[in-house]
UniProtKB/Swiss-Prot annotation:
GO terms for molecular function: rRNA (guanine-N7-)-methyltransferase activity. One of its GO terms (cellular component) is cytosol. Its EC number is 2.1.1.-. It holds the Pfam family GidB. It comes from the Bacteria. It comes from Lactococcus lactis subsp. cremoris (strain MG1363). InterPro entries: rRNA_ssu_MeTfrase_G, SAM-dependent_MTases_sf. Residues 217-238 are annotated as: Disordered. This is Ribosomal RNA small subunit methyltransferase G. S-adenosyl-L-methionine binds at residues 78, 83, 129-130, 148. Signal peptide: none annotated. Specifically methylates the N7 position of a guanine in 16S rRNA. Keywords: Cytoplasm, Methyltransferase, rRNA processing, S-adenosyl-L-methionine, Transferase.
Amino acid sequence: MTPDEFLSALTDFDIKLSDKQIEQFERYFELLVEWNEKINLTAITEKNEVYLKHFYDSVAPILYGLITDQPVSILDIGAGAGFPSLPMKIIFPELEVTIIDSLNKRINFLSLLTEELGLENVTLLHGRAEDFGQDSNYRATFDFVTARAVARLSVLSEFTIPFLKKNGNLLSLKAAQFEEELTDAKKAIAILGGKFIKEIAYELPNGDERHIAVIEKKKETPKKYPRKAGTPAKSPIK
């Protein structure tokens, strides 16, 4: 997907980027490739692949109407090089974005990136989601939590649902279907106060399959969750 094809594909969803936004995506690509030589950010560095598998894929929640042009708060867990939250932030500057990442080198990259792109209202937090999830400054404060290919849903639910306000939504982006994962995660989602709402299946313009699971927080998460760092992955709720 060339940059022009990216713009054209967004136009199909009635999204027209300004010259500034086009330049922001271009600079994003340049910095991603430049920093990827210093720290491991992505295996995808070819320009057309970045525009397809990182930029276009990241903005799917906007394309499919899950996130609209409103000043809502989004927490991105394990965003790595800023996906999916920062491409969405470029398209909808009103979004208030917070990113948690456990690797300080990635936070340094994201700090430079947001400064270079002129992105405001972006908060970068270095640490583990399990620790921040017990912090009253962040717990139950977000409208959305996004996670792109971070962990199986049974584990991801514990990382993410505690951060959501009541009626907030977890948007989990994956390449594969969620059917088996949902069966495994059903109990965890319920215990944590969530409810599976729907799964959106779609294809990238090259035909690759993608899925977004939408889980809404219906009630407060019990205080014991998330458990201490490392426990959810080692011992998922069953």
